[in-house]
Every structure is written in C-alpha cells, then in structure tokens.
Amino acid sequence: GLLLNGKRLFLRGTNAIPTQWLAGYSEEMAQRDVALIKEAGLNAVRVHAHVTHPAFYEGCDREGVLVWQDFPLQWGYAPDEAFAQEALRQARAMVEVLGAHPSAYLWCAQNEPTHNRHALGPLLGAALRAADPTRPVKEASDFREHPYPGWYWGHYRDFLALPGAPLPSEFGAQALPRAELLRRV
C-alpha cells in the first residue's frame, strides 16, 4: 500500500482527462474540478496523458488531493533518436515545473505504450528518477494491467487477481450508479 508521512493511505481516486482544449481550460475551471474531486470524497487524481493548468495543481496542494502525473506520451511513437531526446527534455521540464507541488506523488512515463514500451519507458523512467529521486516512477501505464473484466474482455472474477497491483493505473469502466438511471438514458 501507499504510505504518506509513515501512515498507510487508501487511495480513492479518479482520472482527469480534459474535455476541452487545454488553452480554454481556465483557472476557474481547474478550481471547480478540484472542488468536485473533494466533494466526491476522493483523495487522488491521475492527470492522464497531459500536463494541466497550474491552478489545478495548486488546488490539489491546498485540498490535500494526491496527483499521479502522467508524462504526455500516449500509445506508440517512431523509434527516432531526435524524438527520444526531445521527450527526455520535456520529462525533465515537467519535473522542474511540477516537482515543487506536494500533491504530486508519482510520475508515469507513458500511457499504454505499444511497440516502444521497452525503449521509451526505461529511458524516460530513468530520467524521471534522476530528476526527482523522492517520488516513485512508473515506466508505463500499460493496457495489459488495466482491468475491465466483463467490459472489454475477461470475466468479473478476474478482479481477484488485480493486474498492476498494488497500484493499477486504470480500473473498471464507465457505469451509472443505479439501473433506473440506465433506463432513462
């Protein structure tokens, strides 16, 4: 499990994927999103495959919401040395910009990598560890550890052997909380 200040912490989290262009994501919207996270009784958020508005991180710091921060790499990329060097530069810059936020508790190097998982993951993971040796680093949020049994594949009993444990990066699927709401849709 996760330890925070020497005490076990059970994470109750969600995923933050922007529903609008980041250029249009205002300070007020960021503050509202953090307030909604708190209102939902959550204590953690994964900023999924992007770096978001500074006000979001400031709000998470203020409200005690932990941030799993993805580096904005999604799926596959050409095995190009210039691309790898630019990704390294940006990973270091992300830590420089966000590393002072006490809410940031984990860096993740890429989301759902395909053919390049064994190239970019270790490369960026090492760069993130070197830039911030105080936080854990996950080399990839790998689709093979995203349990959606009964939704995309598998069976609901597959939850008994949780892939990515103890900290899966994705879990479950979209659902309405009550059958009556599903009938309304």
What are the functions of these language-model segments?
Residues 1-39:
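N-terminal carbohydrate-binding accessory modules
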Residues 44-185:
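Substrate-binding/catalytic cleft of secreted carbohydrate-active enzymes
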